[in-house]
């Protein structure tokens, strides 16, 4: 069977100058349709109809033939039917003629072949690419606007509504004339939304470029009571920054899926590194993010061998594996010992909801205290603080105590809600709202400390473990009162008393120190570096 593909590509595009030869994702626009036609298992010959010397060079270099288009067929009023008919070699007998537009770069060759096969099997005269796009639409009839529907329904319940995409028209050669390519027996072949891009505007160009450069993203993250769950929160924030839905992996031996909370992201448990590596070999991700604390060089070498073309980004990693990473972000540390390491608070990823809250106003007196030690609190600081604040001497102050998803003995701590000036909450979704209702904070040296600083809340901080002792930002020099790892109760309570009675002027000074750091721009900095790899 002889099947001819014709790609019309004139030079005179006015809306987007030089449209057909513009570079998109490393190739001229017309490259994609020529490539599909040449790779097709069913198309036997490929001809490009053009009046562009540049298009002819591209086509011939790729191995396609060219039909130089006469000037009389290059005007805006000339129909595509006449152009296609002119390009057909009349000295050969053809079974099908496939019109392929150069403005559909996202079409897949598998879809093209499936449509040709569908046309042949169903003995169609013409088959047109289309997308099913049901909408509540209207038409004009006798000068009035009338609905194209009988009943208003949600989109998924509306009848099919096919829109031509322009990607291809498969026609029996016998029906193609200078006036038409449409025979009597016509059908449409549905293509995916991603393959339906038809470049007519600069906005379409941007969509096509993004679609052709689609990333395959994976995130490997673990969190529990021992290591904390700030990694989980950060992974979910990063996942929202990509224009694809990442696969989020976690080790089922280390992480309870409940710590992810309510999310529609794709969560995939793995039973150890061996299973993760096997999946990576099959998936071949283009971007792989580790948020698992310290990595070994063996782990990183193994990962790179599975996904050799991927860019690997590590967060909060101070292990030897960092030398094999393409990027390392350590917002909690200050050491930038290698060029790929970006350390310090300017790479902190602020939660989206915090961006909508202004720093608190420092009041004359402290009346309300925020207490939270992250998602896990392995030192049980929450328990110790609750025992302190129920003393009669603190009855005139209000305390908000927030417990995280990985905290143990939550039910016992919720019993403290019986005290009128104490509010104990578990796994809240309105953290910035709660924080901004308070005058001071008491926290550890992880994510919550950064959140309090973002809102300009003077805070006391203590470390949960030896690793947190190395965290650089939550310190006295930046406006916190850091009192060490596992300080004695008398130190904690003494510092709290100092803050409760602290003057407005001193608290304002601490707030100024906290707000001197740009914690809100870290998300942008991180993603710019990732996207520019």
Please provide the spans of the model-predicted regions.
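Short phosphate-binding loop-to-helix
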Residues: 53-98, 106-114, 271-281, 294-295, ...
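A short, well-ordered alpha-helix in the C-terminal region of glycosyltransferases
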Residues: 505-520
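Conserved core of the sugar-phosphate nucleotidyltransferase
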Residues: 82, 86, 104-194
């Amino acid at each position: 069977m002889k099947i001819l593909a014709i790609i019309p590509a004139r030079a005179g595009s006015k809306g987007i100058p030089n449209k057909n030869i513009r570079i998109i994702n490393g190739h001229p626009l017309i490259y994609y349709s020529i490539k599909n036609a040449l790779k097709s298992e069913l198309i036997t010959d490929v001809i490009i109809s053009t009046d562009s010397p540049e298009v002819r060079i591209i086509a011939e270099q790729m191995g396609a033939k060219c039909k130089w288009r006469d000037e009389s067929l290059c005007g805006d009023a000339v129909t595509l039917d006449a152009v296609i008919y002119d390009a057909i070699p009349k000295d050969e007998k053809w079974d099908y003629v496939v019109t392929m537009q150069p403005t559909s770069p996202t079409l897949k060759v598998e879809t093209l072949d499936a449509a040709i096969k569908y046309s042949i099997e169903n003995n169609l005269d013409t088959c047109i690419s289309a997308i099913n796009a049901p909408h509540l639409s209207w038409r004009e009839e006798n000068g009035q606007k009338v609905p194209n529907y009988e009943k208003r329904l949600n989109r998924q319940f509306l009848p099919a509504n096919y829109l031509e995409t322009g990607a291809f028209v498969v026609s029996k050669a016998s029906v193609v004339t200078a006036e038409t390519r449409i025979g009597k027996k016509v059908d449409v072949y549905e293509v995916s939304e991603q393959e339906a891009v038809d470049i007519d505007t600069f906005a379409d160009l941007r969509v096509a470029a993004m679609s052709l450069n689609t990333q395959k993203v994976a995130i490997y993250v673990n969190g529990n009571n021992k290591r904390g769950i700030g990694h989980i929160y950060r992974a979910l924030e990063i996942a929202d920054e990509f224009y694809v839905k990442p696969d989020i992996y976690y080790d089922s031996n280390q992480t309870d899926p409940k710590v992810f909370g309510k999310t529609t992201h794709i969560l995939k448990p793995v039973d150890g590194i061996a299973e993760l590596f096997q999946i990576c070999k099959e998936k071949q991700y283009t971007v792989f993010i580790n948020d698992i604390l310290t990595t070994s060089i063996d782990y990183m070498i193994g990962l790179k061998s599975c996904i050799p073309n991927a860019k690997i980004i590590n967060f909060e990693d101070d292990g030897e594996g960092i030398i094999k990473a393409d990027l390392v972000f350590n917002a909690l540390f200050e050491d930038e010992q290698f060029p790929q390491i970006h350390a310090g608070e300017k790479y902190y990823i602020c939660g989206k909801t915090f961006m909508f809250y202004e720093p608190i106003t420092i009041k004359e007196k402290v009346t309300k205290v925020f207490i939270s030690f992250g998602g896990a609190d392995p030192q049980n600081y929450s328990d110790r603080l609750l025992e302190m604040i129920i003393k009669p001497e603190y009855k005139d102050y209000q305390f908000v105590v927030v417990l995280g998803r990985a905290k143990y003995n939550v039910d016992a701590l919720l019993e403290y809600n019986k005290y009128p000036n104490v509010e104990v909450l578990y796994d809240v979704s309105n953290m910035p709202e709660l924080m901004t209702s308070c005058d001071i904070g008491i926290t550890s040296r992880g994510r919550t400390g950064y959140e309090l600083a973002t809102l300009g809340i003077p805070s006391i901080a203590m470390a949960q473990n030896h690793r947190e002792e190395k965290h650089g930002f939550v310190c006295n020099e930046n406006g916190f009162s850091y009192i060490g790892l596992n300080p004695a109760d008398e130190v904690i309570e003494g510092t709290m008393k100092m803050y409760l009675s602290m003057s407005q002027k001193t608290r304002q000074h601490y707030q100024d120190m906290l707000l001197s750091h740009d914690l809100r721009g870290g998300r942008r900095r991180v993603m710019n570096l990732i996207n520019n790899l």
